[in-house]
Curated annotation (Swiss-Prot):
The lineage of its organism: Eukaryota, Metazoa, Chordata, Craniata, Vertebrata. It comes from Homo sapiens (Human). The gene is MYL7. One of its GO terms (biological process) is heart contraction. The modification N-acetylalanine is found at residue 2. One of its GO terms (molecular function) is calcium ion binding. This is Myosin regulatory light chain 2, atrial isoform.
Length: 175
């Protein structure tokens, strides 16, 4: 009888610890942020089974115009979860990344996906199309407002390095 109680206490303690662990993840973010992460998770979870798998990642990349993602890259992404990537794991991964990442570098990395030549610019028209049609779609007015503040080169391409600086440090012209 005593061993049964001890076993039950152990299970209860483990359950409480798991709940505490997952609740800590949710306490790292505001409710609005959690909702945005939930929307992002839903966009990636293409088959709507509550778990992000390799096929989900491949389809997400495909929708973003990147069709030849190496298997190793997809495997590496999935291995970061150390098991099935449900929403709680997804949120935990973002929490870990956001707490240890330089925001400017994270933004630059995202832009580099659209700059295969590494010139530091992205095509304005292609980027505009992505903003209007993918994930959290921008309205045409929002895109124009953003482009009004966006540094462009002479060819009309977005200088994303300067844009990242403005996003993370503010516009040096502002006073």
């Amino acid at each position: 009888m005593a061993s049964r109680k001890a076993g039950t206490r152990g299970k209860v303690a483990a359950t409480k610890q798991a709940q505490r662990g997952s609740s800590n993840v949710f306490s790292m973010f505001e409710q609005a942020q959690i909702q945005e992460f939930k929307e992002a998770f839903s966009c990636i979870d293409q088959n709507r089974d509550g778990i992000i798998c390799k096929a989900d990642l491949r389809e997400t990349y495909s929708q973003l115009g990147k069709v030849s993602v190496p298997e190793e890259e997809l495997d590496a992404m999935l291995q970061e979860g150390k098991g099935p990537i449900n929403f709680t794991v997804f949120l935990t991964l973002f929490g870990e990344k956001l707490n240890g990442t330089d925001p400017e570098e994270a933004i630059l990395s995202a832009f580099r996906m659209f700059d295969p030549s590494g010139k530091g610019v992205v095509n304005k028209d292609e980027f505009k199309q992505l903003l209007l049609t993918q994930a959290d779609k921008f309205s045409p007015a929002e895109v124009e407002q953003m482009f009004a503040l966006t540094p462009m080169d002479l060819a009309g391409n977005i200088d994303y390095k300067s844009l990242c600086y403005i996003i993370t440090h503010g516009d040096e012209k502002e006073e």
